[in-house]
């Protein structure tokens, strides 16, 4: 785009909204800017007419570098730019399309997605599709929420029998219980029965023989049968017995060889009751010479309540651990074997060492028991698990439960002297606990044990997802949601045992189970006191040696590995007092010395957890408050700095305004002085006497040798247009010079200079407006093509019209090609060709066109536009234009005072369509005749020749597209202009009108003359 600088005192600048004085301004589509305001609104880059920039509707100027690029195609947007308000992204009108249907987005309504812009139709379709998908997912999820139906126990599966050495004590109650259990499975789809084995050892304590005999007589719930170990395994793992590998049987061969003589099983009936606790009775078997080892099925992380001090009633109440959500979803998922041994034997393998302080704590914890049970064969709710537990020996070290109900360690040499080694008992037997494990776990048991014994193998708690167990006969596998402990977990040491063994709790009196509500243990393992001595640490280390999986839900008692001798291998300290073990009964037994079953501790733990949560909230709130205070302080500093910057800018603005006022006053003073000087020089110019045409040399002295170029072309014309010199003066001979060497203007002809009448020297004080520092000296003889007046050049060539004008017109009118050339006199020719033609005309010594040099003829025949450009440039560079300075004001006043532009428009050929216009037309002709009387004869002749030539071009306007109005606009700057070029813009309309009137009516004008 381009803009034109104009002078208009009545308009305002678009950018600064200040009035525009006579300084240079830019005008574009009725919008005007100061010269200093015509810059890019983003980068303040100076713009001009040749710059590539955009103009917004509000008048904002944007240069090409700052214009927006399309986000999609990356091209510069030169028309309408669509900018998204959210992301400030720009799109061209072609790329503003929907990414799905590729249609143009209507009404600027769109939805932005990850793929791109979407029209509203596609967006609504997408929303409906998502809503339909969400509804389908909701329906599917509601259909899947149904309770898991447990499969019925197969009636073909035989009940597990009991083998007794030589005899069997079967009461009538056993048969009734068995029948009730079978019928309950058929009628109520309850979970399978739980078998609790009661094994008898060959030795027992003497002080409990009487109690054993009495309790054996009262036992009414045992169902004894004799069966082999192989039958037990086959009946237990019925569904996967074919896939158990032979290696698993070989591993159990040692245990089968050392198995006790008889095994007693009790068939316990599960009930639909509260699953929070399990009460397991330990009835005595009538054998005074045997040590009763009994196994009970318990929950993970069990805790044992103690009996009262009267020792009348004795029971084991196993509490289920309470997780963080106070909800147990899988009770009795992992039944464990509890061996109750009353015989004091030297510990072997994973010996448990309890300190004296621990023993005292055990004794002091007698008062925190729940109510005792009084029925014999009643087990509180045991569901979803069936367990077959076998008789074991006392090879592993055990915790004994004393008669008063408190746990205690056997007083062995290992307890009193931990540094000494104790010889193993000769009657040691291998103790194993068989459970319903899957074939994969049994198959991999040997490799896992070897990995745990590997000194380089790090032992960690097994996650829930890694467990591979068999949950029982037809019991669905469900995981229990247990919140992970934040503390570090206790590392599992080498040589872990697969089962947990407890000492036998002495039983007294009748075994009945009263109705009671058992509370869940809230403290679990996390409330263990940290104040433990070195013996407690060693005890925990040995307790942690029992191999229990940390998984919840599906794990049950695992095959027990042979015990290892205690040694330095197990002396590594525990890393934490808290652990995620779910099945470590030994660990919980040792930690029961801290009264874990107190209901008060449950409340304290809940209070501590709540207090910890409040402390964390307070801590984070305080950190947030500190951060906000720092932000406020930083913002206050920024505000102070910005206020200081604003104050500095305000002071700078005041200083600049003062400077502007001072410069404005100085400018007004200089303008007034320049106007006075101009008036004086105009008076001097009018007083110059004009001689007759015969004395051309005297007449040439009154006119400057160079015409001023209007300020408009001076600013916006290219550099090549300025580089036009007087080529003829460079080739002139020394004899033709009347005084010294002539300076030739290389860029522009300097402004007209007043020449004194007598000595023909330039008048001092006149400052040329042309930026060119060089000027042409006056040549009165007319030998210079450029620099000589029209009269002097015609006198030099002895013709009425200069040869350059005649040659150019003849070349254009030579054939129809020149006259029919589109854009004739409007399009510019090659700058190089134009300069070459001018140089040849300046060097041409012949004064006749028919004797032109061959080179000049060849140049003239190359391009018609170049020939037309040469003609226009010569007319524009005349020191005194064709319509000379002497008649300039008279012509302008004729148009302006009579309002000819409005009263006599020249828009068509029939402008004389009314008598009033005819009268005005005749008045204008008479006025022009009077004015042309002052005009020199050479000027009149050139004007006639040009008018006739333009008439011919005008008649071919259908092909060359140059009508009279267009030709007048092209030739007006070359035919008429003021003395110093200051009125070019102000008088532009009047100049164009008078040129068009003269060229269109030249016959009427010169006919009357």
UniProtKB/Swiss-Prot annotation:
Residues 481-491 have a biased composition (Basic residues). The record marks 826 as: Arginine finger. Residues 162-196, 363-385, 399-414, 493-510, 522-553, 683-707, 728-749 have a biased composition (Polar residues). Residues 11-68, 69-129 form the LIM zinc-binding domain. Residues 143-228, 358-433, 449-608, 664-709, 723-780 are annotated as: Disordered. It holds the Pfam family LIM. The keyword Aminoacyl-tRNA synthetase does not apply. It comes from the Eukaryota. InterPro entries: Rho-GAP, Rho_GTPase_activation_prot, RhoGAP_dom, Znf_LIM. GO terms for molecular function: GTPase activator activity; identical protein binding; metal ion binding. Residues 143-155, 212-222, 664-682 have a biased composition (Basic and acidic residues). Keywords: GTPase activation, LIM domain, Metal-binding, Phosphoprotein, Repeat, Zinc. The modification Phosphoserine is found at residue 763. Present with 254 molecules/cell in log phase SD medium. This is Rho-type GTPase-activating protein 2. The gene is RGA2.
